[in-house]
């Protein structure tokens, strides 16, 4: 499976998360996963919540619509984003 899988219902992302970064940013592909840096620390679910907030803004979908399928307590995550309204510039060449 590649880092980004486009389906009729939406996008499935395989993510490598880098918490406690200096800024929120989609870095690119890292070992067949999409590397995303976020500023939140990996404590008490703060990194997951921040990641969902960041992706909801990037894809213009509600936070509650994004589904964390795998990796709640891990840096390696799999998310499903139903019917994104916008594809971030960093991801367009990867689709």
UniProtKB/Swiss-Prot annotation:
Pfam families: DUF167 (PF02594)
Single GO cellular component term: cytoplasm
SMART domains: DUF167
Family: Belongs to the UPF0235 family.
Protein name (database record): UPF0235 protein MS0322
Species the sequence originates in: Mannheimia succiniciproducens (strain KCTC 0769BP / MBEL55E)
Lineage start: Bacteria, Pseudomonadati, Pseudomonadota, Gammaproteobacteria, Pasteurellales
């Amino acid at each position: 499976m590649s880092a980004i899988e486009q389906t009729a219902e939406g996008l499935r992302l395989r993510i490598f998360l880098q918490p406690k970064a200096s800024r929120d940013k989609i870095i690119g592909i890292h070992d067949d996963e999409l590397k995303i840096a976020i500023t939140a620390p990996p404590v008490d679910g703060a990194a997951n919540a921040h990641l969902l907030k960041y992706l909801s803004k990037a894809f213009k979908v509600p936070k509650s619509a994004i589904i964390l399928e795998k990796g709640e307590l891990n840096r390696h995550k799999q998310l499903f984003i139903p019917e994104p309204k916008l594809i971030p510039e960093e991801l367009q060449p990867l689709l």
